[in-house]
């Protein structure tokens, strides 16, 4: 099966490696596609939206029409994992904790709000053990991390840190505040591949 990684900007290589490792653990044959143009979405069974800079990713995608096609695919049920800035791409609402500024939604396909820089800027990056529903203990790497605020009962909180949602799921969409690709633990990527089957 083909699994894509949005490859406009951000942590692409790390996600490609983790998808391949997760596939090995699950005994699945996976071809990883770097998604840069609308046609790269053809025949994908799942996609990862990596961390990086959500606005930059969106603007680059808009130039080729990738944004519209990706939004359609997600609304049609393409399983997706959005990590950090990737979660912001998916969110219906976005605001910055430091400035209070609200931003226009980018893809806006999931019923949660992303509060950017919730735990502070780059120097406030940290790691913490999380209890993830269906997975158990998972080491979360937080870098300029947001939190997610569910805006509908359709959004299930899978993990929290200090009472704030840091991993959520709505239908075909999984979003994390942290970076699972920066660990050696493939279980969140395995969750995505299981959704794609």
Swiss-Prot record:
Q: Which GO terms describe its biological process?
A: glutamine catabolic process; pyridoxal phosphate biosynthetic process; pyridoxine metabolic process
Q: Active-site residues?
A: 84 (nucleophile), 179 (charge relay system), 181 (charge relay system)
Enzyme Commission designation:
4.3.3.6, 3.5.1.2
Q: Which domain of life is it from?
A: Archaea
The record's annotation in PROSITE patterns points to:
PDXT_SNO_1, PDXT_SNO_2
Q: Name one GO molecular function term.
A: glutaminase activity
* Record has Magnesium as a keyword: no
Please give an example of a GO cellular component term from this record. glutaminase complex
- The positions annotated for binding L-glutamine are 52-54, 116, 143-144
Is Lyase tagged as a keyword? yes
Q: Which SUPFAM superfamilies match?
A: Class I glutamine amidotransferase-like (SSF52317)
> Catalytic activity annotated for this protein?
aldehydo-D-ribose 5-phosphate + D-glyceraldehyde 3-phosphate + L-glutamine = pyridoxal 5'-phosphate + L-glutamate + phosphate + 3 H2O + H(+); L-glutamine + H2O = L-glutamate + NH4(+)
Listed A to Z, the keywords are: Glutamine amidotransferase, Hydrolase, Lyase, Pyridoxal phosphate
**Pathway membership:** Cofactor biosynthesis; pyridoxal 5'-phosphate biosynthesis
Provide the family line.
Answer: Belongs to the glutaminase PdxT/SNO family.
Its assembly, as annotated, is: In the presence of PdxS, forms a dodecamer of heterodimers. Only shows activity in the heterodimer.
**Cited function:** Catalyzes the hydrolysis of glutamine to glutamate and ammonia as part of the biosynthesis of pyridoxal 5'-phosphate. The resulting ammonia molecule is channeled to the active site of PdxS.
The protein in question is named Pyridoxal 5'-phosphate synthase subunit PdxT
